[in-house]
Amino acid sequence: MPILIKNESFNNIFLWKLCFIENNYFLCIVKLKKRRIMKYVIIGGVAGGATAAARLRRVDEMAEILLLEKGPYISYANCGLPYYIGGVIAEREKLLVQTPESFGKRFRIDVRVQNEVIAIHPKNKTVTIRNAEGKEYDESYDKLLLSPGANPVKPPLEGINSEGIFTLRNVEDTDHIKAYISDKQVKRAVVVGAGFIGLEMAENLHHAGVHVSVVEMGNQVMAPIDFSMAAPIHQHLLQKGVSLYLEEGVTHFKRTDNGITVFLKSGKAIPADMVLLSIGVRPATALAQQAGLKLGEMGGIWVDEHLETSEKDIYAVGDAIEYPHPLTGKPWLNYLANPANRQGRIVADNMVFGNTVSYEGAIGTSIAKVFDMTVASTGLAAKRLKQWGMEYQSSVTHSASHAGYYPDALPLTLKLTFHPKTGKLYGAQCIGYEGVDKRIDQIAGLIKRGGTVYDLMETEHTYAPPFSSAKDPIAIGGYVASNIISGAMPVISWRELVEEKDKVMLIDTRTPEEFSFGTIPGAVNIPLDEMREHLAEIPTDKPVVLFCAVGLRGYLSLRILMGRGYRNVRNLIGGYKTYSTATAPLPFPSAPAGGGPSSSVEAATDDVPADASVSKKETLKINACGLQCPGPIMQVKKAMDSIAVGERVEIVATDAGFARDASAWCDTTGNKLIEKHDEKGRYTVVIEKGAPACTSASNVSAARGRGKTLILFSDDLDKALATFVLANGAAATGQKVTIFFTFWGLNVLKKVQKPSVQKDFFGKMFGMMLPSSSLKLKLSQMNMFGMGSRMMRFLMKRKGVD
C-alpha cells in the first residue's frame, strides 16, 4: 500500500509516493495540479508586519505580497529611537534595518510607503488606500494581515498642542525632537510619564545635556514592577540629578516667551524648554472597528489561537491585538517587540498552510536601561496578582552579579512571585547593574513551561567567578522561596511590617556597628552570634520579627528561635535593605531655573565649598567593591583610624546605599565629605579626616540635636562599663544619650542600700539567684571567683572613675 504525503510548497501540490518493489523502496513524486497564486495584503510595515512579509516570501515564493505603510519608513528599530536622540546611537541610518527599496528587492514584495489604508471591506475582500498625493484606490486580497500598532495617549489638556510638546512613536517624531533640541538649544525638559519609554527618554535627554524633570501620576516609576523594586530606581534617578515628581498629574500647559510651563495638580509649576509625553499607548483599532471586527474586553483586536480575527481570512498581530494571558487566561495587551515578531512568523505560516500553528501568548518579559541600572521583569508582579485576587507569596533576595571575591561584583536584587502551596512560578523582577537580563531570561523560560520555584533550585548554569557564583542568584531565590513554602521560614513583607510595627518585637540581628548606622525605629539589637545568650529577653507570647541587612542572618536567627520553641516569629523579606529603600522619603524636587543636568557631585557638595587642594592632599585609596553593607563603611572607619587629621580616604564601593551611609557617617563623626559620585554602579567617596569631636567646637555644635540610644542586655561588669564608656563619649560630643536596660541589664542599676519591698515566691527566688547589687556583678571573662571584678573596681577607684 503506497504512503501518500501532501506537500503544498512552491505554488504546486505534489504527492510523495513511497513504493516497495523487489526489496527496495522508491520515492515517486506525482504532480497533481498547479495552485492558484495567492495575494496577501499587509497593513503596517514595522515589527510584526515586516516579519510576516519576509516569512510569507520564504514559504511561498510565487505569492503576490503587498505591504502598505502610512509612514515613510518600514522595519525600523523603534526601540532605539531614544538612544539616537541622546546621541548614544550616532548614525541615523543604523535605525533603519531595511529601506522600502532594499526590503522590496530582496523579498520581491510590493512595498508602498505613505500609502494609508482608510477602509476594509471584508465582504468584497478589498481595502481602500489613500496615497501621498491624496488619491484613493482599492486593492483586493485573498488574505489580509493587520499590524497597525498602537497610538500614543494624548489627553485633551489645555495647551497640549503647543510648540515644543512631543510624543515619540516613530522616526518622524524622532527627527522633530532631535531638530528641536538642537535649534532651540534646549536645557530643561519635562517628561510626563515614567514608563519604559519615559525613563529611556529621561536618560537620553540627560545624556544630551538637558536637565530633566519626570512627572508621574502613580506613586512609582515603571508601573509593571512592584513598588519595592521601583524604589531603588527612584534613588538612582535622584543621584543622577533627575527631578522626580511622583503622584502628580498635569492640569495644563502654557506657552510663554521663555518656553513652556507645566502646571501640576498640587499647584506646582515646572518651567521647561520642551515636554515629552510618554503617558502610554492604546491599540490602533479604528480600521478594525470600522470593518466590523470584534474587539476584546481591553479594547484590542480580538484574535483566536491562530491569530485570526472574527472575520475569516483577516489576521492581526502586534500591539493592536488582545490575547489571553498564558498564566491566567484573562484578556491581555502586550506592547512588546519580541511577541510581535513571533506572531509575525506564526501568522505567515497560518495564512499559507491553513491554521496549523497556535500562538501560546506572551507573559510579558521586558527590560530597560535606566542610566547605570538595569530593570527587568517577566510574568505577573505581586500587585497584579493582588488586583486579580490570586493567592500568591513573594520572596526578595539580594545577591551579586558574580562571585563577591572577584573584582567589581555588583548588587543584584531578585523578586519572585509564586503560588504559596505548589510553588508554581508567577513572575520575577530583577534590578541591578550586570547580569539582570540572563536571570530574567532563564526564569521566563521556566514560567512559560509551567515551572516552579523548585525548578529554580535545579537550574544548571555556567559558573566561573567573573560571571556568576557557585550558587547563582536564581538558585538562591529558589532556596528562599522553598523555605517559605515549607514553613521553615515564616516571613513578613516590608509593607506588612509598616502596618504591624507597633504590635511586634523587632530584633535587628546585625552587628552593633551596623545597628549604629541606622535601623528600623523601635528595633533592639541582638546580633546573630549572641542570639542564644539572650533568649530570656525575647518574649514567647508576643510576635517577633527578625531582620538583618538582606535576610540571611535574620533567617539563621529565626531557625535558632524556632528550634528553641518559639512559634510566632517571622523574618523580614529582603531585610533592612528592602525596608529602608521602600520607606525612604523622596526629597522635594526643585524646578530648574536653567542650565544643564545637575550632577550627583554637585548635589552632594552643595554645602561643602570646593577645595582646590584635593589633588595635593595625601589620599589613601580603598576598593570595597563587592562588599555588602556595612562592609564599605567599616572599611572607611578602619582607613580613617590609620591616617592623620587632614589626610583623605578615597573609597570605591558597589553597594547602592554606600554614598548615603558615608554622608551620614561624616555628619556623625565630624569628618569632612569632600566629594561623591557614581558611575556604572560604582560609588566613589572622598572623605577628609577631621579633628576629634571633643576638641572641635564646630563639630560639637554640628552634633548638637542628635541623639544616641544604647541598649544594655548583660549584667557582666565589663560589658556594662563598655556601655557607659560609649555613653559618656557620645555625651561629650553634645549628644543626648539614652540607655535601655533589659532584664539582665537591670541588675546594673541595683543599689547597695535599697528599700524593703514585698515579693512573692518567684520574686524571692529571682532575688536569691541574681546579683544583689552592682557590687556583685561578675566579668564575662577572667572572673576568678570574683577577684577579676574586685581588681577592676580597685583600679577604677584609684583612677577616680565613679
Q: What residue ranges belong to the model's regions?
A:
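Glycine-rich dinucleotide-binding loop and its adjacent helix/turn
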Residues: L146-A208, S243, V303-E305, V524-L528, ...
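Beta1-alpha1 glycine-rich phosphate/pyrophosphate-binding loop at the start
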Residues: I37-D110, V153, A202-I225, A362-T365, ...
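FAD-site-proximal beta/loop scaffold in flavoenzymes
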Residues: N161-Q185, T261-F263, K268-D349, Q442, ...
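A Rossmann-like FAD-binding core segment of flavoenzymes
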Residues: M62, R112-N131, E139, H206-V303
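Mid-to-C-terminal Rossmann-like scaffold of FAD/NAD(P)H-dependent oxidoreductases
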Residues: I37-M38, A320-E434, P465-S469, P473-E499, ...
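Short hydrophobic core segments
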Residues: E139-G149, P271-G280, G344, G423
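Rossmann-like dinucleotide-binding cores of NAD(P)H-dependent redox enzymes
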Residues: L96, R188-A189, F196-K254, N334-A340, ...
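Rhodanese-like catalytic fold shared by cysteine-dependent sulfurtransferases
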Residues: Y454-P465, S469-R495, E500-M505, P512-V545, ...
